[in-house]
Amino acid sequence: MASPLTPRVVCIGFMGAGKSTAARSAAAALRTDAIDVDQLIEQRLGKSIERVFAEDGEGTFREAEERVTLELLERPQHRVLALGGGAIGSQAIRDALRDELVLWLDVDLGSAWERCQGSGRPLAQDRESFERRYKQREPIYAALADAIVPSQRSDAIAPVLEAMHGLPPGSKVLWAATASGDYPAYFGSALLSRNFWPPAIGGRRFMVTDGHVARHYPSALEPLAGRVMIMPGEQSKTV
């Protein structure tokens, strides 16, 4: 993860997830420019990605993708990038992303196919291979991500970036989008014992917990305005 003071935001995700939209939203929040790697590759090669696949093959495209992506990641002035959906297939790119702030734009398979079919994308020609790629890539996106953002929130990245400020290394943010409102859910080892509290979230602190968990963290998140104790078990859980 990059330093929260000078973050470089890298948007990853499957085809049709809204990576370019998210990159523009992040760039606006950080007052900088977004770079779409696929568009830059087209400029460098002088032809569309569709033509590169048809005339030169996927291998040529992947070589250019890796070269251009690594070049951008080596330059700190490029603060917001949108990668192609398959860029994470490169081990070199995955290694380079370890030091960046990675946002995974998570789109469900049905929505991705609906957005991509008939668009001319070379890897969205048939549903079977499309679904196979989706299933292959999903665990890689999840492993690389510092934040997981639903694709329907790709145009509202500023609050996600605020929620990640000060996040301890190795932790993740899942951005929950609900009918009643959006909020960050935090995952990470020993977050409670570190007394982590997002600086972007003000106001009074309340803890909602069950009896089994509460006894292990009697003073977590102090000072608290109050505690709400619920019965342990699945019957007490809601989304």
Where are the regions that the model predicts?
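Walker A/P-loop
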Residues: 20
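Hydrophobic anchor at the beta1->P-loop junction of P-loop NTPases
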Residues: 11
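ATP-dependent small-molecule kinase phosphotransfer cores
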Residues: 36-96
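P-loop (Walker A) phosphate-binding loop of NTP-binding proteins
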Residues: 14-17
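NTP-dependent small-molecule kinase module
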Residues: 2-4, 29, 139-178
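A glycine- and Lys/Arg-enriched "phosphate-lid" helix/loop adjacent to the NTP-binding pocket
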Residues: 99-140
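ATP/NTP phosphate-donor binding region
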Residues: 170-239
